[in-house]
Amino acid sequence: MTASKGYAAPETGQAYARARRLCEDLGDVTTLVRVGYGQYLYHLIRAEIGECHRVAEEILAFAEKTRSDEARILGCRTLGVSLFESGQLEAARVQLEVASGLLKEQRQRGAANRGDAGVTVPAWLAFVAAFQGYADQAARIRDLSVREANSTTSLHSRVFGLAFAAGTCCVLRQYDDLLARADAICALATELNFPFMLAWGMAFRGIAELHAGAGGGQAAWDGLALYRQTNSKWALPFWFGCYVSVQRHPSDETISMIQEGLDAIEATGERWFEAELYRLRGNFVRSLPRGGVKRAEQDFKTAKRIAASQGAKLLELRAATSLARLWSEHGRRKDARELLAPLYGWFREGFDITDLKEARTLLTALA
């Protein structure tokens, strides 16, 4: 049902609710973990972040009762993801690393994990690490997830692993092989008749083509339209932000899309891409003839503050670079250097990614 109707379809939610009532009547805690996971996905994809977190906590509580490592891995992973959704990056990573450690212990004992944890746990860890500013770690963990995805017999797990690897590439602005990744996602999702992941693949394809200057706008729009048809609201701010960030000729449609993303964040509490949307809005409004510079400065400051509060060092650096560039263009070179230098100095890896290169180039110009 999830593949054909979508994770967020009303029929899916109703089916899991019936299954949960039955498990509770029977006192079947083991099955409650699996049913709870279905409910968690239902709320996640609908961007019902509060409910998602509540169900994730229940899953972990059920898992502790079963004393099953597999269930505990699932519980820690779902709780980690729900924490990430609300912008609590470090707390999210702690839970995901517990899941990763349990998975490693399970493998050392020679026990096979019957779920998709070998793909999903490193996929999420890579995603979180990228936001936290650990680009090299993120790339290594991402590649591990892809290897696991390519070796699994579960095609649904495989397409998830490929999709999240593409997402991590977008966060790190590593677009070189994004088109090939998108094509692989589309092919596998089509084979599985899986509209949810086909939408991801189409959107990634459009983003890759836009970045390369080869059109792509329609492909991205078609992917987003298909995504909405599956009742999915999760990660819409991310998709809007990725689309806007590669546009070469922003328009009024650009600011409308950014605002829709910010409105969605306020409605859902899904805050992990909030800082980037404010930064992108700042980039757009800075060229407006009346009050553009002041509005841009405020948006860049807001983006930096949000990113700092979440521990999203990569987005904080990105916002600081935009703000420092604005200040330097208006005679505040000393302020710009003092803002950007300490933040750039925090980084110990990832010096080949676009964000660090841009920050380093600006600091050199400000020296």
Which stretches of residues belong to each language-model region?
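Flexible inter-repeat linkers and adjacent short helices
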Residues: 1-29
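Non-membrane alpha-helical segments in proteins
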Residues: 1-5, 33-45, 74-85, 123-130, ...
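Helix-coil-helix junctions within alpha-helical repeat/solenoid scaffolds
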Residues: 15-23, 60, 76, 91-103, ...
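Short coil/turn and helix-start
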Residues: 6-10, 50, 108, 112, ...
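A conserved hydrophobic secondary-structure block that centers on an alpha-helix together
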Residues: 43-49, 66
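Extended HEAT/HEAT-like alpha-solenoid repeat tracts in very large eukaryotic scaffold/adaptor proteins
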Residues: 117-121
